[in-house]
Structure formats: C-alpha cells, structure tokens
C-alpha cells in the first residue's frame, strides 16, 4: 500500500517490503471498502513503522477529511485520503494515545479508533459458552458497556460460526455495513469494541453468509429493543438498577413452611389500556395492577411472555428477543421498577418463558448466519408444524447456553420469582404434531427428545442451585412421568406442573347442563386419582377463553343467574381442590366475551352487582386460602385430603376434607352442582364438635339466593363416609360451601 505525499506514491514500512505484501494489503483494504470479508485488524488501526513511528489507517466512507488528535484535541497529524475510496492514512511520529477527528458532511466527530484496541473478550468465556454455560453467554455476548483502559464504550459480541464476515451497523455509523467489521474469535464468535457508543443507540449485525448474502440481524442477546414493528436492537442503559426489595429476596426460602400459591395470569398489553387503546407502560401498570392484585389477595402475578416478540397476535409466544422485555411497555428499567414494586407489595412475579420454538422472521434467529444455527437443518426436527415456527437444536451446547442464559437473566437481573415454561410437551416428543415418517427417532429409535430432556434438567438444576426458592412451572399436557420429580430420581426437576387434565375434565363438566351432569360425575372425581403424582397447579388460563369459546362465565349453562352461580361454585371448588391456583384476568369478575389481546378487559361490567359479587368471591377465596393452612399445607400430599362424598352422581354432589398436616383445623368443602337445593344432607367429618360455615358461594354478598347453614353446626356421633362423625347440612343450589372445624 502507498500513501500519497505531494502527488507521489511512497511505500511505507508497514506495507511490507515485497510487491506481494503491498498487493495483499491493497486487496484487503479494497475488500473492506467494498464491505467484503477481510481481516480489518490486519490493516486498519495503528501499525508500527521504523523509529517509533506508526501508520494509522481508517475506513470511513463518506468522510470529507480526517485528522489524528491527542486526548486534549491537539492535532497530531492530518490524514490523507488513499486511492481506495473511504480509506484514510496518516503517520504518527511518536507513541502515545490518539483519537480520530472525522469531518462528515453534517458534523465533526471526535472518537477513539476502534481498531486500535486489542480483543476484550476472555477466550475462556467463549470456551464456556461452547460447553453450554448460560452465565458465560450473559457475561460475553450482546452489547456490553465496558472500558478499554479509561475509554468507555460498548463491546458487541455475537455467535455466527458460518459467517464469512460480521459487522456492527447502527445509529453510530449511519447503518453503513462497511464501517465496522468485527474481529473473528474462536468457535465462530465475533466481537468489536466501539468507543463512546451510548445507551439508546440502535444497532444490528450485518452478517455475510457463506454464499455472500448480507443478512441484517437483530442481536440475539439484546437487552433492549425498538418498539415493534421496528426490529433493531438497542444499546441498554449502563447504570445498574437500584433495587429496594432486599427483604423480599431474603425471604424467598425454599425450605420454608409451605405457603399459599394463588396466581393471577395477566397479559400486560390488554389487562387495561389507555384512552387511545394503547398498552399501559410499566409505571402505570404498577400503579393500577399491583393494588388490584393486592385487593384480590393473589400471591403472584404471572405475565404472559413479555420477551420481545414481533407479532402482538402471538400473545408473546413467538419471541425473538429472549433477553429483552418488550418495548411495548417502556424501558427495561421500567420493567425492573414494576417487579420491585410488586415485591414491596408482597407479590411475586412469574414470567411465561418460551424455549420450545421461535418464529422465522428475517431479522431473527432463523438461518442467523446463513445456515441452520439455532434450529435443526432437517425440517423433520427443526420445523414446528402446528405453529409454523422453528425448533431449537437442544443438542448444540451454544444453543442451550443461549436459552439457559436467558432464563438466568430474567431471574437474576430482574429478580423474577419463577418461570412458567411453555409447551414442554412439544419439547419432550420428537413426533409431537407429526405423522408417521415426518419425524426423526432418537439414537435409541424412540420418540423422546433426549436432548430436550437433558436441557430441561439442566435448566431446573441450575435454577435450583443458583436461585433456590425460584419456581419453575411446566406447561406439560401429557402423562410424561416425573415432571416435578427430583432429577436424581429420574425426573425433570420442575417445582410445579400445570394440571391440564383437571382443567379439561372439570371445565367440560361445568359446561354441561346440570341435567346431564349425573352421567359425567367422574369428570369431577377422576383428578383425585393422580392429584398427588406431581406438584400441580390448577390452571384456568388464557387458553380457555379464546377462539370463540367466550369467557368462563359465558361457557356456563343456563340463564344469567345460573351462569353466575355455576362459575362461583366452580371457582370455590377449584380453590378447595388439592393443587395451587391460577386464574386468567377477567374471570375474577365474570367477563362474558372471549379475551381480545388488542383491547382492555370489559371493566364496565363491574357496574353490575353480580360481577362485583364474583370479584368479591375471588377475593374471599384468596383470603380463605391464606388464613386456612388446611387449604395449602397439604396441597401436594395425599394425607392432606380425604373424600367424604365421591359417589353421589345422582345429585351431582361431592364433598371432601382438606387436612393440615401440621395438625391445624380441617376444612370440609361441599359442592352441589344442580339447581336443586338439598336439606338435611348428611356428610361424614373427621372431628367432633362445632363446624363453622366460612364461605358460601350462594351468599347474597356474591349475588346468590342466600341459602345456607346459619353459621355453626354441631356434629352428630354417627359414623359416615369413613369418618366417626357427621354433619346435617343445607346445600344451596349450584353452590360450594366451606365449613371449618372449630377448636
């Protein structure tokens, strides 16, 4: 390469002493100027010359002039435009720090030379990622604020092993793919430190595939994103969030006495909307949602996926930004403030987290470096036919490290109290949603996805080890054994599993006309056959109020009075049933219509007394749960439950006793699921003395007919239903009652 001096070309020492060396440097610079694959660090930045001098080359297409300045702004040397468009060259007479003064058509920029810095990524971190370490992903990849010496900036790092070239493009370089090619590291990782880049800058990676295509990709490990439908990643804030939830975090003890778990499932974008039908931001959600959840007595909020997702109609279940809260509600710090406020209010936060699949949007993970990377190359393994999405390659350590890092990011960085892992069944089976011949057996010829099993165990092991007390809840719709069993016993290691069977059976029963229920009584009782096989959550979730089904209230049979009565009885039966509770927003006040993700819940319904009564009932159910150890201490233990009446199908009545394994007062729950009241109905109970009716869904407070048991009842010393005593009860129509033994 030559530098132009007075119109004459003179070879410099940095170019090498042979024509081959000059040609090679020229070719490299020309390739860089054309945005083609080449080693930028071989020719750009400072290169030593004789007598302590250095030659500096800079690639700045579109610049009008350039100089080299010292840290105080004094000119050290003027740079000359070379014969290669966009390349500037200059000579520094002495060693020492320098900066670039770049004259653009609209401004003058002073900044350090990114190609003057050595690699900043520790090679051991990259090896850890290649071995499947999620924490290493968090420390190494994405846009990280770092200092090189005393120079602040952002280190960009990404995994793209099939790429010929990767460059960072963004607001800081005019989105010019030529400006900032990255340094290639071992294992297919790429990195570049860009001085003085600030929080809020938008960026992407320009990835040159093996076939020469240039793909503009969002950062898989971006901590912040643009507001969809825009797709760029955003450099996050460098400042650490100031948490105020130390007391909550200290009390998150997995060894503590079992506590109530009652979850309010929320789609943040449609719980309530502003006057322009736009989603609320995190501060407004904190101001409105948290007191509401406190008032109703739920212990946790479970958020439908807020990981960034391009399509709002996916409800968040097709995410591409697994490390970033969606920009629909504001900044990442805004989300941290929301979680912090929840914790101060005594409410836990669970995130619906999707590790089963991802969409094929062009800016996302699909064919990230021009080839199958995060997904399988074979569509029989890599394509999810039910959802037209792509399946993660769980057999690739870098991919599982990416997923593990995401889970750990939400738990550690955002102080989340649990993850509900979506679509676990689709992960566990290679033939999920596939016909014969459309799937690839595992190494043993079976249908189990052994790599996914290993990943889920690793996920649960790491969370339990690093963050004891954090919940991991599986949405698993099959009979896979041991979902919540210990990994050492061959289980998957989740803390909880959604009881989809209970939901389908009982909701199906409640949707029937009461005249038909006698023939389907087993739908109410069968769940107790397996109720203690796993640590179950009973879910009445978003999936039950979409696709034309109507809200839970609208799915109940009969006239309006009976619909309300049916739903009240059902919810009270659910709260008494073994297992933890989950209720989707809107059900607590009896929303009639389908859930619509594009609009607010129908809050105006609370102008009606029956809807207010439903809401009051849910609050009272949570209050009963909190103050009645028999309802939660034995939720996952067979000794916490006894049948009293399981076989009265003719009257559609069932009754059972919940026990406190610590010896507290037992509770009797009785449901009459016909509109016919029953007087002098005998039910066996385990303890003699007075039993007090503590909840009756037929109470006038809730909109019922106010038939009940007038407070307290004394037992009769007559054995019944396997118990030594019995109660003579009045069973109101379409109602559930709770009675608790008094001391």
Curated annotation (Swiss-Prot):
Biological role: Catalyzes the formation of the alpha-1,6-glucosidic linkages in glycogen by scission of a 1,4-alpha-linked oligosaccharide from growing alpha-1,4-glucan chains and the subsequent attachment of the oligosaccharide to the alpha-1,6 position.
Keyword Transferase part of the UniProt annotation: yes
Record EC number: 2.4.1.18
Family label: Belongs to the glycosyl hydrolase 13 family. GlgB subfamily.
One GO location term (cellular component): cytosol
Protein name (record): 1,4-alpha-glucan branching enzyme GlgB 2
Pfam families recorded: Alpha-amylase, Alpha-amylase_C, CBM_48, GlgB_N
UniProt source species: Xanthomonas euvesicatoria pv. vesicatoria (strain 85-10) (Xanthomonas campestris pv. vesicatoria)
Segments of this protein annotated with the region Disordered: 1-23
Pathway in which this enzyme or protein is active: Glycan biosynthesis; glycogen biosynthesis
GO molecular function: 1,4-alpha-glucan branching enzyme activity; cation binding; hydrolase activity, hydrolyzing O-glycosyl compounds
Gene name of the record: glgB2
Quaternary context: Monomer.
Gene3D superfamilies found in the cross-reference section: Glycosidases, Golgi alpha-mannosidase II, Immunoglobulins
InterPro entries, per the entry: A-amylase/branching_C, Branching_enzy, GlgB, GlgB_N, GlgB_N_E_set_prok, Glyco_hydro_13_cat_dom, Glyco_hydro_13_N, Glyco_hydro_b
Catalytic activity of the protein: Transfers a segment of a (1->4)-alpha-D-glucan chain to a primary hydroxy group in a similar glucan chain
